[in-house]
């Protein structure tokens, strides 16, 4: 009897320590809980299949595919944690395998009670105890100007196939900066990998931060992804409704706050996009809101029917939204109810889809077939 009890206890511990997998009748995929994290914000895969995961309060972690979580890395900059601010996105340099460069975005403090987003790059190494450390960290970009408040940082990043770095910069809940070309708030930014400004940027001759700008008129762009044609798309939170999926084009103005398919939270109306055809309109938009966070363009083999689709992390509906594109048109075709706010979504090396829940006690999920 004692041997049987010990055997059952051992099996019980094994089950509890292994990733938990489930499949519901409502979802066309299996969901495996890999790990639990505290306010995770972004993740990216290393060449060996492990994940780098950021937590908003300022921790950078290594997570194995079996759910083992490292101690927090050292060498990070000072993070201004609070409101919507903290440690944000993380991406690898396109030549990471040879240069070991990673890029992080985060909120930082300025003078007084002013804040702004920043992007830094560093060499990722591991010490003799296999503890992660960021070395030779350098800040390559900052929001300008820094302003009061702790919202709408944006600060998503994506490299294109030519090695240019694109950064989404929110308008910091100040409305008008999105149309102010003397600052880089409410813009999509295009830089070289070292933070220098390409001389073929549309406003390069204007100099200063204006030279960084690729497109303008953005509100709170929380997702950036390239499709299989190399075109850049972004998800963008509208005001009261009017969330957007935009095809981001060189030198185009996306209209906020002059136009939006949403309205101000005060109830004050904003003219719709169709009233101002001189601004670039979204390819699709949502009312009611989906509060879109990150998006990916799916190209894997595991979910063949999802190819040519964007998968969007939906905070408000607690769902993953699938959008199909056809040339320059876009249409939502499916919505998968996850039952919890979704902050981040990435495609794994084997075509599985990995998801980060939002908030404290948030799960890292792996979706498979």
Where are these regions (language model features)?
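Positively charged n-region of N-terminal signal peptides that target proteins for export
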Residues: 1-4, 369
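Bacterial N-terminal signal peptides
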Residues: 6-15
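Acidic, Gly/Ser/Thr-rich repeat motifs that build Ca2+-stabilized beta-propeller blades
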Residues: 20-175, 231-234, 238, 288-325, ...
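Surface-exposed loop and turn segments in beta-propeller and other repeat-based domains
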Residues: 73-85, 136-152, 194-214, 257-286
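Beta-propeller blade signature
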Residues: 117-127, 181-194, 248
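Repeat-solenoid scaffold signature
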Residues: 209-249
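Active-site Gly/Thr loop motif
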Residues: 219, 264-275, 290-291, 319, ...
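Conserved blade-ending motifs and adjacent loop-strand segments that build the rim/top face
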Residues: 329-349
